[in-house]
């Protein structure tokens, strides 16, 4: 999966670069809905390689690795990799039905 993201003022830090938090948020937007619905983020490893500024466009590509992790690669308009992330996900714990919890406490 891939998507484009144009850096806005909301993405910037105090030095007017795209913030570290924004790179992670942008990358995670490429996660499939079925993963987000049934799993939670376990770990994320980030390698920041180049700075990105206001109005620059990033292309974020996501692919699944052999071990089941997800590789997120963000490149700028020149094709330069600006950030790479590896995310690992785990199944969400079972959430009891609210009515069951309420009945147990009565």
PLM features: residue spans?
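A conserved acidic, glycine/proline-rich C-terminal tail/linker
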Residues: 34-71
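HotDog/MaoC-like acyl-thioester-processing domains
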Residues: 52-54, 63-106
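A broad, structure-centric signal for solvent-exposed, well-ordered loop/edge residues
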Residues: 14, 19, 25, 53-55, ...
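Hot-dog-fold acyl-thioester-processing enzymes
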Residues: 1-40, 94-106
